[in-house]
Amino acid sequence: AFYIFTKVKQRYLFMLKAKKGRILISEPSLSDNVFFKSVVLLTHHNDEESIGLILNHPTKINLNEILNDIPLSDLPIYIGGPVEKQSLHFIHTLGSIIPNSKQIIDGIYFGGDFDTVIQLMHDKKITKNEIRFFVGYSGWEAEQLNNEIRDDAWIVQTAKNELCMNYSTPKLWSDIIKTKKMEHAIW
């Protein structure tokens, strides 16, 4: 038993750790309805909490069903996670053009001034490939996410711009799993 525990602990030491700008890929064994076959972008991580958005679970509604009279009305909305499902969040590539944005990785930003986003949409200065909207978010308390990673619920990987913004979502999880763990590719 000690040998097995030591091997597991040793493997955990060499895994990528959770931090802002990394993605979490759910293991096939994670059968939670919300996180089943999920890819989550961590937008915030510290000793007290972790926050992220699920990149690959689109809802059946578009932006025009929430906000009236805006261009890009056919923009799909994604399920960000099970927390505060009535809240609207967004990631984008526009940086300081949207005041109060927080950089997640090079070229990807979280949030910012929503009135500016609406104005940029009306001015047709935002394209579909530059912004994504989410309802709700994914959240973990202190050490909860680290424990889930240690228990093999998540694979941690460095996020890339094209993963966050320019990817066809239905196959995102399976494509990543194929590159990370061949034994899970059939899932």
Describe each region flagged by the PLM.
Residues A1-F14:
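Short, Lys/Arg-enriched N-terminal segments with co-localized hydrophobic residues
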Residues M15-F134, S138-W187:
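A short aromatic-anchored loop/beta-hairpin motif
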